[in-house]
Curated annotation (Swiss-Prot):
It catalyses: a 5'-end diphospho-ribonucleoside in mRNA + GTP + H(+) = a 5'-end (5'-triphosphoguanosine)-ribonucleoside in mRNA + diphosphate. It comes from Saccharomyces cerevisiae (strain ATCC 204508 / S288c) (Baker's yeast). GO terms for cellular component: mRNA capping enzyme complex; nucleus. Residues 415-459 are annotated as: Disordered. This is mRNA-capping enzyme subunit alpha. Changing T255A: Temperature-sensitive. GO terms for biological process: 7-methylguanosine mRNA capping; positive regulation of transcription by RNA polymerase II; tRNA processing. Its main location: nucleus. It comes from the Eukaryota. It is found in: Nucleus. Signal peptide: none annotated. Heterodimer. The mRNA-capping enzyme is composed of two separate chains alpha and beta, respectively a mRNA guanylyltransferase and an mRNA 5'-triphosphate monophosphatase. The active site is at K70. One of its GO terms (molecular function) is mRNA guanylyltransferase activity.
Length: 459
């Protein structure tokens, strides 16, 4: 558990969380940008569903899909807007709790119409991106760096793209956002020294290349825990589950987020008077019971405890059980308990990501998820358990690659009328299969796909 926690530390957003009134104004802007009737109270990003055996026939064989690695980082949207009062461009990151963080230091230009000097004269306004904030290991310096990997675009310069197919959204992302950003860094590096982190487009492959992508996961400069299958022609589902958007994980990577509650034993000191408040005290030398609670829905009024030595009292438990119920116990060894104590951090009430041990069936902790206010809803937990029981292995996926390619070719031939002409989705995908700023090269056939800009590492 301890080693897993150290390697799975989630990155922190390098920004300032915005107060309620500012956040509300920003939510209204996003609402109007996405043509929503009213501001959503939840994260406006789409949510994938867990991969099941039935998805092979019903989805992967029936529709064109992209496949990419599933980054194990921090899912955030990036909202870029010009302040109507000051005229200054602001960059905000939206986490899964729908908090808005102001990230200073960036400048995002529009695509120049005639000359490169326009990169210094024009600014993005009303652009909403989807991606993952991740900690990467620089292969040159071996130092850890923060990077934002973009994989979708909900709006570009005030134009809502959610009803456009994925292929079109990615084309807009590459041409109208990433290219001018990349060109600005290349042409005017002295103007980019304040950028708090680097940005890349996540590499997309056709679904029949899933084996190549899966076998590249351990070669990436960041943690990855599976694959994402995105339908080529589907619109973007903002603020909810997308039944066509699939996440595949190896069985051992299927995880659940629980609320952690510690039952710390109390002992009596008979040497103290019976009316002494210190006669009974918590015994931290004895390992407590680690209970995992699953969220039933509703607002969680319990806040994470500020002090380690203040477990939940009876009243707090009563409040907790309005929205949570005990699901299981966490397996913690004596050594792991000592390591947790050495952290000198609050433990009670924190959200923890856990995996089920395939051999023992015990739940083991991977990391704290302080980016989440609640654990997974009970319905999500049920889906994850079903996914574990109905797990699709990489070997299972390898066996259907030929069928996926055959179905692709049949659809391509049917839409082209047998003329052999490439489909629009094919040519559009080709513009996105390279992380270079020139978006006209065909998908790479390299054994190790390029997920980031290699010339980006040295600066």
């Amino acid at each position: 558990m301890v080693l897993a926690m150290e390697s799975r530390v989630a990155p922190e957003i390098p920004g300032l969380i915005q107060p309620g009134n500012v956040t509300q104004d920003l939510k209204m802007m996003v609402c109007k940008l996405l043509n929503s009737p009213k501001p959503t109270k939840t994260f406006p990003g789409s949510q994938p569903v867990s991969f099941q055996h039935s998805d092979v026939e019903e989805k992967l064989l029936a529709h064109d899909y992209y496949v990419c690695e599933k980054t194990d980082g921090l899912r955030v949207l990036m909202f870029i807007v010009i302040n109507p009062v000051t005229g200054e461009q602001g960059c905000f990151m939206i986490d899964r709790e729908n908090n808005y963080y102001l990230v200073n230091g960036f400048r995002f230009p529009r695509l120049p119409q005639k000359k490169k000097e326009e990169l210094l004269e024009t600014l993005q306004d009303g652009t909403l991106l989807d991606g993952e904030l991740v900690i990467q290991t620089n292969p040159m310096t071996k130092l850890q760096e923060l990077r934002y990997l973009m994989f979708d675009c909900l709006a570009i310069n005030g134009r809502c793209l959610t009803q456009s197919p994925t292929s079109s959204r990615l084309a807009h992302l590459g041409k109208e956002f990433f290219k001018p950003y990349f060109d600005l860094r290349a042409a005017y590096p002295n103007r980019c020294t304040t950028f708090p982190f680097k940005i890349s487009m996540k590499h997309m492959d056709f679904s029949y290349q899933l084996v190549k992508v899966a076998k590249s996961l351990d070669k990436l400069p960041h943690l990855s825990d599976g694959l994402i299958f995105t339908p080529v022609k589907a619109p973007y589902t903002a603020g909810g589950k997308d039944s066509l958007l699939l996440k595949w994980k190896p069985e051992q990577e299927n995880t659940v987020d629980f609320k952690l509650i510690l039952d710390i034993p109390m002992v009596e000191d008979p040497s103290l008077p019976k009316d002494d408040r210190n006669r009974w005290y918590y015994n931290y030398d004895v390992k407590p019971v680690f209970s995992l609670y699953v969220w039933q829905g509703g607002a969680d009024v319990n806040s994470r405890l500020k002090h380690f030595d203040q477990p939940f009292d009876r009243k707090e438990f009563e409040i907790l059980e309005r929205t949570y119920r005990k699901f299981a116990e966490l397996s913690v060894s004596d050594e792991e308990w000592q390591n947790l104590k050495n952290l000198e951090q609050p433990l009670n009430g924190r959200i923890v990501e856990c995996a089920k041990n395939q051999e023992t069936g015990a739940w083991e902790m991977l990391r704290f998820r302080d980016d989440k206010l609640n654990g997974n809803h009970t319905s999500v937990v049920q889906k994850v358990l079903e996914s574990i029981n109905d797990s699709v292995s990489l070997e299972d996926l390898e066996e259907i690659v030929g069928d996926i390619k055959r179905c692709w070719d049949e659809r391509r031939a049917n839409m082209a009328g047998g003329s052999g002409r490439p489909l629009p989705s094919q040519s559009q995908n080709a513009t996105l299969s390279t992380s270079k700023p020139v978006h006209s090269q065909p998908p790479s056939n390299d054994k190790e796909p390029k997920y980031v800009d290699e010339d980006d590492w040295s600066d």
